Amino acid sequence: MHTKVLQQGLWALLLWPHLFTVSVPLDCRDDQASLARCPSISQEKLLDRVIHHAELIYRVSEESCSLFEEMFIPLPLRLQSNQGGYACITKALPIPSSKSEIQQLSDKWLLHSVLMLVQSWIEPLVYLQMTLDRYDHAPDMLLNKTKWVSEKLISLEQGVVVLIKKMLDEGAMTTTYSEQGAFQYDVQLEMLEYVMRDYTLLTCLKKDAHKMETFLKLLKCRQTDKYNCA
């Protein structure tokens, strides 16, 4: 186990500069100009960068989930989680999961669905970073990956907002999902409950990150080959 974690740490050191390098172009914060850089990028280029950003977020969230599972989740608890009882925080969002339903979504709803997913995860990831501090022997690599995803989700949110303005010529729809208390902080949980809750968060994040990537790639396909986007 120690050797495996060490190997993963070495991979993280190799991957870390790459993550920051490829994600910088989508970071729309530029001094006091807020979204000054993103509007200057063409729609096609911005969509490509948003997709690449989503791919990286999915990859790192998948690695984070696997690392957490190896470090803290025995096999019986993994099976218990897979059997249900731990609902994802985005379950109530009006976003379809089946392939046929996703294919029927308009470009507008694809973009707004991605935005809803991104915004729904910003607060829970802040919580996750705080709770990981309670763990004994939590590897720095896991903490760093979680922090990276948290920061880059905000950057992705900015990119999608500009993309909505460019492609749909409108502002983003206002959602009060997170304001309604969809994510609750439980301060009286036992340690095992903390572990299972955090594991559920990481598992659901991985699924939703993959969904973001899928929606954006479908949108890209429609721009280039509208009738062959299966």
Curated annotation (Swiss-Prot):
Domain of life of the organism encoding this protein: Eukaryota
Upper classification of the organism: Eukaryota, Metazoa, Chordata, Craniata, Vertebrata
Protein name: Somatolactin
Family designation: Belongs to the somatotropin/prolactin family.
A GO CC annotation given for this chain: extracellular space
Signal peptide coordinates: 1-25
Keyword Secreted appears in the UniProt entry: yes
One Pfam family in the UniProt entry: Hormone_1
Biological role stated in the UniProt entry: Selectively regulates proliferation and morphogenesis of neural-crest derived pigment cells.
